[in-house]
């Protein structure tokens, strides 16, 4: 991954410390499934047109990624807005923009580029702080999604806030950002459910390094104690069975943050 120019510019990445001011923006995670053979064309459209038009209409582009093992031809990206009203107004203006319509028409001369879109609205957790500009160097991002048992998201957030972030850093993982689903998911297209979902990003030197870090993390007596105490307080596991999903990502060449 190339050197980051400025994380403050794009406002995405987090540190383990709490933010001096809460980040009240609305975030959106969007996943596009490209038609067979069309992912390169989709990336070209974003590179040449879409990012500029998003900026024109007041949307903040954060990161654009593809999975390391991209068997589904996915593009995963994150945007930020002042609030939901700003988001809806920005998309309405973008979709009506003649420049967008022309770019879409030209790019789809040989067929549609996208077969399916998923979207979820996110809010920053209180332990996901904006960080100073920094370079991550070579490596991979990891997108992790946790689904909790009903009523246990607060317990999960508390465990991350008080223990997990520090232990991740101890074992060589870099905390990037942490989100919960926004309460208002109207218009979203996602299987995720508000009130029981934590979504976050880490960086690692490699997928192998990630495995080694998590193996050491899970064996750490401090983690074992924190996990046991949090589950005792909640009355059971904080996440549902098979409720932790992980996907390694690499940034596209046009991603603002790399």
Task: Walk through the language-model features, giving the residues of each.
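Short S/T/G/P-rich N-terminal loop/turn motif that feeds into the first structured element of a domain
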Residues: 19-225, 229-258
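Bacterial N-terminal signal peptides
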Residues: 5-15
